[in-house]
């Protein structure tokens, strides 16, 4: 029987191997093992040799890192369709979809087949989008973008990020927007940029509250401040370099040359620093009006005062030379009155909280919220943080004294929920436009079907991170959606073996 002796257990074979391979084994041990197991001496040697081979093979170092389990993928038509949709969702062009399927799944498909399957899926997505009819219980924001020289009009919920409308239109004039917004007049507020077509459409649809976007004002403002700061630092760097060259020079002529250049650069640096400091003060004054809560009064910003302040700052910039300053001046003067439209709606949200918890307690919590929002939004120096800590602690003590610790946390959650909404613009619609641009840029031809597919996938896919993590826009809007939304497009669920 040799090594095939079935009556010798694995533990016994292991013990035989260890004793035989030991360099300190006693004389006559092989004979003793052969008598113990009733086998020949050669069988003992064979078992030890077999055990040595197993140890050498099992203890050989393998590759480093994790070892994914081997899996056999069953490729069928449904998997190819699913792959085509997912790759399209990721912004892959139709031609590249064919390449990816061939490389990843070893399945060669034609461009015509991909286009045909996507057309069917887009048609089903349009039916699914039509079937979704959530109630509009949030504010909306709108934006327009162009692809293949055609405008696409977009309506997004500011709380859920649900796309209520995404359509290809012949133009983006006021009449077109008015028709699109005609059944959205009951929304809390509508936010947009300062486009004339959008403004005319909002007026035609009789939407009561139209809020202009603060980001369209602040983005170029702080962008110019960053450019002025960069220019000032560049001149200071040249000035430092000229000082170094001056110290290394010994000849009188060269010294005079470096001195003349240094004086010229010093005048430029002084001028650019002064320009930056003056513009930074203007930008900071405009940015202070962006806050929802006035820290001095712990109430909503006084719209009349802020409007007058913005217009006065616009008049200051009007005297500055440069196209960017004229544009900023025009925006400040023309947009100021429409940048605070949100306050009427926000006041309606805060009033019930003041009734429940008391106006002074809610005012203290609003002040705390604004202090923390300012710290998250822009970096502050240590002295500024210490200075902000004093009113934060005073407001907290006041809120505890007025409401008690138990009601404090309930009121704080309500205040954070109320003030945490998107009140001041259409930046969320532009974020969705940024996602859509990835898909449109990869397609030589776009139509309404492409937009319907993007709308469906965006509304039904759950967010991976952020405050909406684990929820899709459709679920946040009150709709029931399966965990695998592609089932709604008549695409079979993924095979369990895959």
Give the ranges of each region predicted by the language model.
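Basic, short loop/linker segments at the boundary and entry of helix-turn-helix/winged-helix-like folds
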Residues: 1-18, 40-87, 135
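Short alpha-helical "recognition helix" segments of helix-turn-helix
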Residues: 29-37, 97, 101
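Major-groove recognition helix of helix-turn-helix-like DNA-binding domains
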Residues: 38-54, 107-122
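RNase H-like nuclease fold core
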Residues: 67-96, 100-208, 227, 256-261, ...
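Inter-helix linker motif
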Residues: 206-229
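Active-site proximal helix-loop segment of RNase H-like, two-metal nucleases, encompassing DDE(D)
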Residues: 231-247, 251-261, 418, 428-446, ...
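Non-catalytic, alpha-helical, charged scaffold/linker segments
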Residues: 235-370
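C-terminal domain-tail junction helix/linker
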Residues: 277-280, 284-295, 363-372, 376-387, ...
């Amino acid at each position: 029987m040799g090594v095939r002796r079935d009556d010798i257990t694995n533990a016994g074979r292991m013990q035989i191997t260890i004793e035989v391979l030991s360099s300190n084994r006693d004389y006559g041990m092989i004979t003793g093992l052969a008598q113990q197991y009733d086998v020949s001496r050669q069988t003992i040697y064979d078992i030890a040799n077999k055990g040595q081979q197993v140890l050498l093979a099992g203890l050989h170092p393998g590759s480093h890192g994790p070892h994914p389990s081997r899996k056999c993928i069953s490729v069928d038509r449904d998997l190819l369709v699913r792959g085509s949709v997912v790759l399209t969702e990721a912004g892959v062009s139709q031609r590249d979809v064919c390449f990816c399927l061939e490389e990843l799944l070893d399945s060669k498909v034609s461009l015509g087949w991909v286009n045909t399957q996507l057309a069917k899926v887009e048609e089903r997505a349009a039916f699914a989008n039509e079937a979704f009819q959530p109630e509009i219980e949030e504010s909306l924001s709108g934006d327009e973008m162009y692809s293949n020289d055609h405008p696409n009009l977009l309506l997004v919920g500011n709380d859920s990020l649900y796309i209520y409308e995404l359509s290809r239109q012949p133009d983006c004039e006021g009449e077109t927007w008015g028709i699109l917004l005609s059944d959205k007049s009951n929304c809390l507020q509508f936010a947009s940029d300062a486009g004339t077509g959008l403004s005319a459409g909002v007026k035609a649809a009789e939407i009561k509250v139209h809020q202009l976007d603060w980001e369209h004002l602040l983005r170029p403002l702080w962008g110019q401040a960053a450019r002025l700061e960069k220019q000032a630092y560049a001149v200071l760097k040249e000035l430092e370099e000229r000082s170094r060259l001056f110290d290394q020079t010994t000849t009188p002529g060269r010294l005079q040359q470096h001195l003349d250049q240094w004086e010229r650069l010093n005048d430029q640096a002084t001028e650019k620093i002064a320009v930056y400091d003056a513009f930074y003060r203007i930008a900071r004054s405009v940015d202070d009006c962006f806050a929802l809560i006035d820290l001095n009064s712990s109430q909503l910003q006084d719209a009349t005062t802020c409007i007058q302040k913005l217009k006065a700052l616009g008049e200051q910039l009007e005297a500055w030379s440069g196209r960017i300053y004229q544009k900023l001046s025009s925006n400040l003067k023309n947009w100021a009155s429409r940048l605070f439209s949100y306050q009427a709606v926000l006041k309606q949200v805060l009033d019930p909280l003041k009734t429940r918890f008391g106006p002074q307690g809610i005012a203290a919590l609003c002040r705390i919220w604004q202090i923390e929002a300012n710290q998250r939004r822009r970096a502050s120096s240590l002295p500024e943080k210490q200075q902000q800590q004093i009113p934060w602690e005073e407001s907290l003590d006041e809120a505890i004294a007025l409401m008690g610790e138990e009601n404090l946390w309930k009121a704080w959650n309500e205040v954070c929920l109320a003030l945490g909404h998107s009140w001041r613009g259409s930046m969320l619609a532009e974020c969705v436009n940024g996602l859509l641009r990835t898909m449109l840029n990869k397609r030589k031809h776009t139509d309404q079907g492409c937009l319907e597919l993007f709308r469906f996938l965006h509304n039904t896919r759950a967010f991976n991170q952020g405050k909406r993590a684990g929820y899709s826009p459709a679920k946040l809007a009150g709709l029931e959606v399966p965990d695998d939304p592609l089932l709604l497009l008549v695409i079979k669920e993924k095979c369990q073996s895959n």
